[in-house]
Swiss-Prot record:
Pfam family, one: S4
Keyword Ribonucleoprotein recorded: yes
Superkingdom per UniProt: Archaea
Family: Belongs to the universal ribosomal protein uS4 family.
Record-level Gene Ontology MF annotations: rRNA binding; structural constituent of ribosome
Name the record gives this protein: Small ribosomal subunit protein uS4
InterPro entries linked: Ribosomal_uS4, Ribosomal_uS4_arc, Ribosomal_uS4_CS, Ribosomal_uS4_euk/arc, Ribosomal_uS4_N, S4_RNA-bd, S4_RNA-bd_sf
SMART domains the record matches: Ribosomal_S4, S4
Keyword Cytoplasm (UniProt): no
SUPFAM superfamilies in the cross-refs: Alpha-L RNA-binding motif
Gene that encodes it: rps4
Subunit structure: Part of the 30S ribosomal subunit. Contacts protein S5. The interaction surface between S4 and S5 is involved in control of translational fidelity.
UniProt function note: One of the primary rRNA binding proteins, it binds directly to 16S rRNA where it nucleates assembly of the body of the 30S subunit. With S5 and S12 plays an important role in translational accuracy.
Keywords assigned by UniProt, alphabetized: Ribonucleoprotein, Ribosomal protein, RNA-binding, rRNA-binding
Length: 182
């Protein structure tokens, strides 16, 4: 058992350092999602790895003789958690959890949702708006680009109240609107 005040590593690095296909895939994802470094990508992969491990454990428990009601309870807990974060559909099963891709996890980051909702022109600008405190969820400022947005919070993303970007005539807002028209 470790000391609770100590920060622990939240990701696992790849086993092979120089694997050409993996490096190319990582580079593409970093550019597409505007990640700062590969550590952010590895964190997303580690989170998915934990979910898939939980799903595999459920399959093993089911074949190992766990009662049906206990299996359904544990499965519903896992699926409801993933549904709340928008990673699976409402009627998902263990197979859907095992089929999760890292892109689905990265799509739920605040940085990606700010870009997709039209608050920024590029992934880098979305990241900048978030870190500079221009973006809020439910009226509360969020300054973490990697914040995992729940399905219920998705509609509540907006510009932060005192931010100059709340003004419709702000020059950057007009640039964002023009970029969205193209």
């Amino acid at each position: 058992m470790g000391y609770p005040g100590k920060n622990h590593k939240q990701y696992a690095t790849p086993k092979r350092r120089f694997e050409k296909t993996r490096l190319e895939d990582e580079k593409r994802l970093i550019i597409d999602y505007g990640l700062r470094n590969k550590r952010e990508l590895w964190k997303a992969q580690s989170v998915l790895r934990k979910y898939r491990a939980g799903a595999r454990e459920l399959v093993a428990l089911r074949s190992g003789g766990l009662s049906t009601e206990d299996y359904l309870k544990k499965r519903d807990q896992l699926v409801n958690h993933l549904y709340r974060y928008g990673l699976v559909g409402e009627n998902a099963d263990v197979g859907d959890v095992l089929a999760l891709k890292v892109e689905q996890q990265l799509d739920r980051r605040l940085q990606t949702l700010v870009l997709r909702r039209g608050f920024a022109r590029s992934p880098k600008q979305a990241r900048q708006f978030i870190t500079h405190g221009h973006i809020a969820i439910k009226g509360r400022r969020v300054t973490i680009p990697g914040y995992r947005v729940e399905r219920a919070e998705e509609a509540e993303i907006s510009y932060y109240g005192p931010s100059p970007l709340t003004n419709e005539v702000h020059p950057e807002r007009s640039r964002i609107a023009r970029a969205g028209v193209r």
